[in-house]
Amino acid sequence: MIIIISGPPGSGKTSVAIKLANELSYKFISAGKIFRDIAQKMGLDIINLNKVAESNFDIDKMVDKKIFEFILSEKNLIIESHIAGWLFREYTNIAIYLWAPLKIRANRIAIRDKISYDQAISQIIKREYMHYKRFNKFYGIDINDLSVFDLVINTSNVDVNNIVKLILTYLSSVSQNPQPLKEKDINDK
């Protein structure tokens, strides 16, 4: 089964995806890690690579290609990505969206990245604005449309372990192996 975990910065998607992958003994891949690796190779931080990506679609295509290669080659996979739910939904079994209010996400990011709360707020707003513009421009995606997701979870007042339990309960309640909407074909992406 291939499961997508999407959501905005600070929603808990990486922590939840890693824990879920461990619980299910699935392979885990992170679009954010792929993106950060590209940034590091280019000598940029995330904000500046996002700025470059606004005018250079090749950066997003590199990330997308890498993710799609995993989709084609893995049977049991957890994909953590801001936009995989929209891009790859038709090739996967389950798509989950995690979210939390901006203040909670900023607090999490401030603690995680050891920056001030105000810096975290500023970073999130910049990243989300860049994501919204870029994903709409290049993919025609409205990241506010959550209709592609099977499950949407507010992570505000729930810890990672309980979110994973909730997801596992959901997975046990759906068809043993919900089918992707489309057969995997390398020529598609």
UniProtKB/Swiss-Prot annotation:
- Keyword annotations for this protein? ATP-binding, Cytoplasm, Kinase, Nucleotide-binding, Transferase
- Could you say which EC number(s) this protein's record lists? 2.7.4.25
- Binding-site residues, ATP: 7-15
Q: Which reaction does it catalyse?
A: CMP + ATP = CDP + ADP; dCMP + ATP = dCDP + ADP
Alphabetical GO CC annotations of the entry are:
cytoplasm
Any one Gene Ontology molecular-function term assigned to this protein's record: CMP kinase activity
Which cell locations does it reside in? Cytoplasm
Gene3D superfamilies noted in UniProt: P-loop containing nucleotide triphosphate hydrolases
Q: Would the keyword Coiled coil be found if you checked this record's keyword annotation?
A: no
UniProt xrefs under Pfam families? Cytidylate_kin2
Query: Where primarily located?
Result: cytoplasm
Q: Which GO terms describe its biological process?
A: pyrimidine nucleotide metabolic process
NCBIfam families on file: cyt_kin_arch
Would you identify the family this protein belongs to, as annotated? Belongs to the cytidylate kinase family. Type 2 subfamily.
Descriptive protein name: Cytidylate kinase
Q: Give the organism, scientific name.
A: Saccharolobus islandicus (strain L.S.2.15 / Lassen #1)
**Gene designation:** cmk
